[in-house]
Design a protein with these regions (language model features):
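Amphipathic alpha-helical interface segments
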Residues: 12, 16, 88, 92, ...
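Short, structured helix-loop boundary elements
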Residues: 6-7, 27, 49, 53, ...
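Short secondary-structure transition hinges
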Residues: 87-127, 154
């Protein structure tokens, strides 16, 4: 077996969480599946909460990579760029929900319970909204206005008829 690393531990934890859920996954489960003692995990993580937090952050970074890497095309207005970026944000979250609903719900439920993770993610989104739009000190308001389209609480509604039209209505009101 390869040398034990944070990445190997996270991969195994994710596999077990997928099967058992977060509440039922223990460090003993993870260690046992890696053929190490649970004490070996403490060389990489302070505790189960630390491991799960790192796992949730990894998932959030992976699923948000395209959103934060987005750059506007040359010649496009800041308003059009913001519209396109917000639509990408909405559709990225929607696609993740459709692709692997179980993991989406597991991770987002976990993240939503951690105020610091939520605060940091929303701040990062707000910063990107300001960068894209050029609207200084308006990022939080922009992200809040479009909360229906990216907050996991509303995920079950993202497939309803009129979703795109509602997005455009909110956009017109904010524009």
């Amino acid at each position: 077996m390869a040398r034990l690393s944070q990445e190997i531990i996270l991969d195994m934890a994710e596999k077990i969480i997928y099967e058992k859920g977060m509440e039922k996954t223990t460090l003993y489960d993870i260690a046992g599946n890696l053929n190490v003692t649970h004490a070996a995990l403490y060389k990489h993580y302070r505790n189960k909460e630390d491991l799960f937090q790192k796992l949730a952050l990894r998932w959030l970074e992976e699923t948000s990579r395209e959103i934060f890497a987005w750059t506007q095309e040359a010649g496009i207005s800041p308003d059009d760029a913001l519209h396109d970026w917000l639509w990408l944000l909405a559709n990225t979250k929607k696609k993740r929900y459709k692709t692997d609903r179980k993991m989406f719900l597991l991770y987002t439920d976990y993240i939503e319970q951690n105020e610091e993770l939520v605060k940091n993610h929303v701040a990062h989104l707000a910063q990107k909204a300001e960068e894209v739009s050029g609207r200084t000190n308006q990022g939080n308001a922009i992200i809040t206005a479009f909360i229906y389209f990216h907050n996991p609480y509303f995920a079950s509604r993202w497939e309803q008829a009129g979703y795109a039209e509602l997005f455009e209505d909110v956009w017109q009101m904010m524009k």
